[in-house]
Amino acid sequence: MKYPALIDYKNVNILRRFINFQGKIIPKRLNKPKLTYKQHRLLRKSVKQARYLGLLPFKTKDFF
């Protein structure tokens, strides 16, 4: 699976894989599918753009 082709602000299901339960972007070193720096930079931009458009939450409610 080629992630650069799939990483887009409209592809919310792929972006949710790289966000933890609090809505934060998971660091590059902790991602399960290892992303390159360029791919992670594209991921960050796409997540931020999806947040601005209301497709992803900025922060979810705390469970505690």
UniProtKB/Swiss-Prot annotation:
Family matches, as Gene3D superfamilies: Ribosomal protein S18
Write out the GO cellular component annotations: chloroplast; mitochondrial small ribosomal subunit
Q: Which GO terms of the molecular function aspect are on file?
A: small ribosomal subunit rRNA binding; structural constituent of ribosome
Record's protein name: Small ribosomal subunit protein bS18c
Subcellular location(s) of the protein: Plastid, Chloroplast
Q: Which family does it belong to?
A: Belongs to the bacterial ribosomal protein bS18 family.
Q: Does the keyword 4Fe-4S apply?
A: no
UniProt organism field = Euglena gracilis
Q: Could you describe the subunit structure of this protein? A: Part of the 30S ribosomal subunit.
Top-level taxon of the source organism: Eukaryota
Gene name, per UniProt, is rps18
Location (main, coarse): plastid
